[in-house]
């Protein structure tokens, strides 16, 4: 499990901090920078882990609604389209 709440979304020069360590997490948490100021929480999991979740097993006060999902999408799109990570590195 990698907690990318503070380190994700390019803050370390990579989109996610784990990319700098040569490992790949089974589960990753995101928040804060993912929404670029809009409160959001997210849990990403590989299929082998996610397949064990059933409706109601996991919830988030700031996850899944249309506003925060649009904000997260726009944030990721801006990071990619504006080559922000190139400038960070």
Predicted ranges, named:
Residues 1-89:
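Conserved N-terminal phosphate-binding loop of PLP-dependent enzymes in the Aspartate aminotransferase
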């Amino acid at each position: 499990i990698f907690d990318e709440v503070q380190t994700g979304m390019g803050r370390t020069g990579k989109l996610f901090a784990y990319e700098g360590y040569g490992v790949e997490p089974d589960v990753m948490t995101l928040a804060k920078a993912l929404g670029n100021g809009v409160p959001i929480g997210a849990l990403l999991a590989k299929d082998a882990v996610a397949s064990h979740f059933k409706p109601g097993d996991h919830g988030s006060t700031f996850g899944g609604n249309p506003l925060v999902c649009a904000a997260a999408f726009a944030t990721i799109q801006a990071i990619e389209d504006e080559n922000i990570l190139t400038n960070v590195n």
